[in-house]
């Protein structure tokens, strides 16, 4: 029979201290009853002799030192999982909020997951189609990869996340695909935008949503991504599905960690974040991957807003060390009404080279991507020179690069929020834009591929003659 403890020794924000505890374990879940009626859940985060520090998952406002009873469950935080979770919406601690009743779970799993043996991992291959040219063409998302989006306040990362959910699919017509979407610290209107968008597009049927609102307890934000990944791992590794996990906003997760760490009186590290921020982020990001001998995969797109657009801030900085590339959104492109405002040059996908090309996308994919990167870099040089000497004084080739740069931003990077481009459309568009430049400038493409795909753009005079 479980022992029930009456009263608390102190309350500090989301943390409460229980004394005289015996047999408690780190990360153990406790059930707390307030005034004999309201029930709350908490987690033991520290143990000193007979003292246990407990993080309460809900508000502690109505809790007092004498009106609370605490019972140790002897178990870690667990979630009931089932394939029926697809198409359902839950709050930040896994309780259903869509009015469709509780889930009949097939089993209970520890939300902390089990670390994947590096030897058991299979190297990620095959791409995930997003329908967005800047991603599919230049920073291709590979199954089993973790590819974050670095955004900033006011940039359209929510709209981009919704578009990815609407359009994401597996190449080759496979249908064993699902999405787990976790929103942390979002405002109600943003959460409502996601719900409406998924329902109107028809994507909701294969999406499991976890929503932690801005007015929900801060501590829930530390649980939400773990719940989402536990469900994703179950669907991927036990039901052989390919699962895309979108986590937004990881900055809210890190700030929640800072707040809880501060209330525990821990010594802060960079920018006030705890010294274990790196290991906590790694514990989430490293749950992506493919296990050898299992058909399923877990792919992650964590989204984070960089404070003051600072890519050296601890959150994007540490994220970059752990993940396999990044997609960076740019405020200048946003000001030019380019959507999605993906900054091509600092963006990359480290696993892209092994999941594209013949047998995956198209044989010219890598060459086209390399050449577009190279040409767009020269656009920056031409624009810098034009700002000094004036556009009229530029050489003819520099003027051609300016024309290419404008067309590239408006036509290749820019697209309608509901436009779903196939990989063939994306690559053909890339060749069309490269046709604005003379063949002699295309030095990153194999000669045989140039002969097959390159067609120079017609000048106005040539078009009139034809």
Labelled PLM ranges:
Residues 13, 49, 94, 116, ...:
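Residues that form or immediately flank small-molecule/cofactor binding pockets and catalytic motifs
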Residues 137-465:
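P-loop NTPase catalytic core
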Residues 68-70, 77, 84, 97-146, ...:
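P-loop NTPase nucleotide-binding/switch module
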Residues 92, 96, 167:
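Mid-sequence acidic-hydrophobic segments that form the walls
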Residues 20, 56, 93, 101, ...:
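Glycine-rich, histidine-containing beta strand-loop boundary motifs that form or position
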Residues 13, 37-39, 49, 106, ...:
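A generic structural motif
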Residues 1-88, 93:
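N-terminal accessory targeting/assembly segments
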């Amino acid at each position: 029979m479980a022992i029930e403890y009456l009263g608390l020794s102190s309350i500090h924000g989301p943390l409460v201290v229980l004394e005289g505890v015996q047999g408690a374990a780190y990360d153990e879940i406790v059930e707390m009853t307030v005034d004999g009626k309201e029930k709350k859940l908490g987690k033991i985060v520290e143990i000193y002799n007979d003292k246990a520090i407990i993080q309460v998952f809900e508000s502690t406002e109505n809790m007092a030192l004498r009106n609370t009873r605490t019972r140790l469950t002897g178990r870690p935080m667990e979630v009931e999982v089932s394939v029926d979770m697809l198409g359902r919406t839950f709050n930040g601690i896994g309780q259903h909020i869509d009015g469709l009743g509780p889930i009949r779970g097939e089993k209970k799993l520890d939300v902390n997951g089990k670390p994947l043996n590096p030897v058991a991992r299979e190297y990620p291959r095959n791409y995930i189609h997003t329908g967005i040219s800047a991603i599919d063409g230049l920073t291709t998302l590979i199954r089993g990869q973790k590819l974050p989006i670095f955004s900033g306040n006011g940039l359209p990362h929510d709209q981009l996340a919704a578009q990815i959910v609407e359009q994401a699919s597996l190449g080759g017509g496979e249908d064993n695909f699902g999405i787990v979407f976790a929103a942390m610290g979002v405002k109600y209107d943003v959460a409502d935008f996601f719900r409406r968008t998924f329902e109107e597009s028809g994507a909701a049927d294969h999406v499991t949503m976890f929503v932690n609102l801005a007015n929900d307890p801060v501590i829930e934000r530390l649980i939400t991504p773990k719940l989402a990944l536990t469900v994703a791992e179950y669907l991927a590794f036990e039901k052989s599905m390919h699962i895309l996990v979108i986590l937004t906003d990881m900055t809210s997760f890190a700030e929640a960690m800072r707040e809880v760490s501060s209330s525990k009186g821990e010594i802060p590290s960079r920018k006030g974040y705890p010294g274990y921020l790196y290991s906590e982020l790694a514990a989430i990001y490293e749950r992506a991957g493919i296990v050898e001998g299992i058909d399923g995969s877990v792919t992650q797109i964590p989204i984070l807003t960089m404070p003051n657009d600072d890519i050296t801030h601890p959150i994007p900085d540490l994220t970059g060390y752990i993940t396999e590339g990044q997609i960076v959104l740019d405020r200048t492109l946003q000001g030019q009404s380019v959507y999605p405002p993906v900054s091509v040059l600092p963006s990359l996908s480290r696993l892209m080279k092994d999941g594209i090309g013949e047998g995956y996308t198209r044989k010219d994919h890598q060459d086209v991507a390399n050449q577009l990167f190279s040409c767009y870099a020269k656009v920056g040089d031409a624009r810098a020179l034009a700002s000094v000497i004036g556009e009229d004084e530029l050489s003819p080739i520099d003027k051609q690069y300016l024309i290419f740069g404008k067309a590239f931003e408006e036509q290749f990077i820019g697209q309608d929020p509901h436009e779903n481009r196939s990989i063939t459309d994306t690559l053909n568009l890339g060749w069309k834009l490269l046709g604005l430049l003379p063949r002699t400038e295309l030095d990153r493409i194999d000669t045989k591929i140039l002969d097959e795909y390159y067609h120079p753009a017609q000048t106005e005079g040539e078009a009139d003659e034809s």
